[in-house]
């Protein structure tokens, strides 16, 4: 309790020395005063649990996979709140990992969709899960077309494949990035002729297209592998064009232009591995983007504003606290959209 500095064990879900490992699979979700999370009690496997912070009660919400086996709610990283209902991945022991739901208003739990018939499971949302209105967009494998973009409309419980980007194989949407701009999803995918590149799906008219092929041919540019952030209408992300290494790129969604923002670590500096911007941190403060990047002097803090890119440190070696210097006299590069 931050008001009186007291600390206490809230509950002992699994008696003994092993522990219940709450939140192992899924990020805790707060609905009203109640926390929802996965935990294992030692008898029913890892299942969905809840803790009401208003009265300190804790209970198992549902035993999705009956017996000692685990339902593993939230495995793979998909959990999303729509109204009073939590949507998540779970395995009931017969249909594999599929999309499930729990309505917190009436305590009902059900399988929302069985995308891949049989016991294998479609493992939805392993790479991406984004809510647009009442509809969840996510990747899933139906067993025939591989991992593609799917959707589930929570208002009418309908589920469908949005696009088969890579016919007869997986396009693996969202493997390196997925972000919503207005009604349009921007995500990484591969179509079989080009590698993992930047794609888009307009949810208002159901059109899907490749936004940019940053690295020509079958190799991948892997957009957003380390960072992706929206500034106004522009997405900033890391990508590898095959010649300058992994550097800072941008896509203006208002005019469909894509460009390399800066070649921070030029090819003349120890090969073409690139600066790997945002590998450890990225944050937007006002109009300025702050991120880490690699130069010959090591990994340091950098910043970008429209029209310029500036190093905020000097000297050699990696910064480890402190080391911040005035930007005056720091390395500066300027790039403009093409």
Residues of each region from the PLM?
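Ser/Thr/Gly/Pro-rich low-complexity, disordered linker/stalk segments of secreted
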Residues: 310-336
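Feature 14080 marks short, conserved micro-sites in well-ordered regions
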Residues: 1-313, 319
């Amino acid at each position: 309790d931050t008001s009186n500095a007291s600390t206490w064990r809230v509950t002992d879900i699994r008696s003994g020395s092993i522990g219940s490992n709450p939140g192992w699979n899924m990020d805790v979700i707060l609905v009203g005063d109640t926390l929802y999370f996965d935990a294992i009690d030692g008898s029913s496997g890892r299942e969905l649990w809840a803790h009401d912070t208003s009265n300190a009660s804790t209970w198992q919400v549902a035993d999705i996979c009956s017996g000692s086996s685990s339902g593993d709610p939230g495995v793979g990283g998909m959990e999303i709140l729509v109204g009073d209902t939590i949507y998540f991945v779970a395995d009931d022991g017969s249909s594999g990992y599929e999309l499930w739901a729990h309505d917190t208003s009436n305590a009902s739990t059900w399988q929302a969709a069985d995308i891949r018939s049989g016991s294998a499971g479609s493992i939805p949302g392993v790479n991406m899960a984004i809510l647009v209105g009442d509809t969840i967009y996510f990747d899933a494998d139906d067993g025939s077309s591989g991992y593609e973009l799917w959707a589930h409309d929570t208002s009418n419980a309908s589920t469908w494949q949005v696009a088969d980007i890579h016919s007869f194989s997986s396009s693996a949407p969202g493997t390196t990035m997925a972000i919503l701009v207005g009604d349009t999803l921007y995500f990484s995918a591969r179509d079989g002729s080009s590698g993992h590149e930047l794609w888009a799906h307009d949810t208002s008219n159901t059109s899907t297209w490749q936004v940019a092929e940053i690295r020509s041919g079958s190799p991948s540019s892997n957009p957003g592998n380390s960072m992706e952030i929206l500034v106004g209408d522009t997405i900033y992300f890391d990508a590898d064009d095959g010649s300058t290494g992994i550097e800072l790129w941008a896509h203006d969604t208002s005019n469909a232009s894509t460009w390399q923002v800066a070649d921070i670590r030029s090819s003349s500096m120890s090969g073409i591995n690139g600066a790997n911007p945002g590998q450890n941190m990225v944050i937007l403060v006002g109009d300025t983007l702050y991120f880490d990047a690699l130069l010959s002097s090591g990994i340091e803090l950098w910043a970008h504003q429209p029209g310029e890119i500036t190093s905020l440190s000097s000297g050699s070696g990696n910064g480890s606290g402190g080391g911040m210097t005035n930007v005056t006299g720091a390395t500066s590069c300027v790039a403009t959209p093409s």
